Amino acid sequence: MKQLESSIRIEVKTDYIEEQSSPEEERYLFSYTITIINLGDEAVTLKSRMWCITDANGHESKVEGAGVVGETPTIKPNTAYQYTSGTVCETPFAVMQGYYVMVTEQGETFKAPIAPFRLAAPGLLH
């Protein structure tokens, strides 16, 4: 199982969407672009996701669902799949982490962990 998990590399890029945010209403919109790279020897299909989002007040929310952005992509060996999505937070800083549930061509299911990453409005972190 560990070998399967290590065959998937996940890269994240985040952006603060200032023009759609409203700090006076405690509404901070962030986008995140995820690149999922299959370093393994067989294709894998992303079946579902689980996100845990913790804002600066310590409030935690979980988001689970099938696929990503309406797709359940199959990622062939040595290729990547990329998508962009977004989330709204009540604070200008939050941390997201989670995992993707993946299935190999042989039908073996495993979780590909997504390491914690920051969502931050500019000017908050030094």
UniProtKB/Swiss-Prot annotation:
Transmembrane segments: none
Any Pfam family: DUF525
Domain ApaG: start-end pairs: 2-126
Domain of life: Bacteria
InterPro entries: ApaG-like (IPR050718), ApaG_domain (IPR007474), ApaG_sf (IPR036767), Uncharacterised_ApaG (IPR023065)
Name of the protein in its database record: Protein ApaG
Protein encoded by which gene: apaG
